[in-house]
Amino acid sequence: MAATQYYGTGRRKTSTARVFAKVGTGNIVVNQLPLDQYFGRETSRMVVRQPLELVEMTDKLDIFVTVKGGGNTGQAGAIRHGITRALMELDESLRPSLRAAGFVTRDARKVERKKVGLRKARRKPQFSKR
């Protein structure tokens, strides 16, 4: 393990996260803000910490994240994906446990586009028989 810094790119919905991990004390910084300050909801914070808790490295790595686009849920998911990729770069033997938890796979679900003649992506205008 020659590298002192490990990198992973994570994506979810329209969010993209660039994650840098290095050996440290467990600080997580997102866009120059501490994790607790950046995400108001506890669920988002929990999602970000999931891969670290799974491999029991919560207090062994410092995580520095730059995230753009999307909302809270998308950004949290993108950060989780990025942290997972950085962990795999750090130690490839973590891949099976991370894959079993479902963190390695990129969640490809995106918002479906609105179609012409419909009110939303699939919602049709109200139909009146008479």
Swiss-Prot record:
InterPro entries: Ribosomal_Su5_D2-typ_SF, Ribosomal_uS9, Ribosomal_uS9_bac/plastid, Ribosomal_uS9_CS, Ribsml_uS5_D2-typ_fold_subgr. It comes from the Bacteria. Keywords: Ribonucleoprotein, Ribosomal protein. One of its GO terms (biological process) is translation. The keyword Ribonucleoprotein applies. One of its GO terms (cellular component) is cytosolic small ribosomal subunit. It holds the Pfam family Ribosomal_S9. The keyword Transmembrane does not apply. GO terms for molecular function: RNA binding; structural constituent of ribosome. Belongs to the universal ribosomal protein uS9 family. This is Small ribosomal subunit protein uS9. It comes from Shewanella sediminis (strain HAW-EB3).
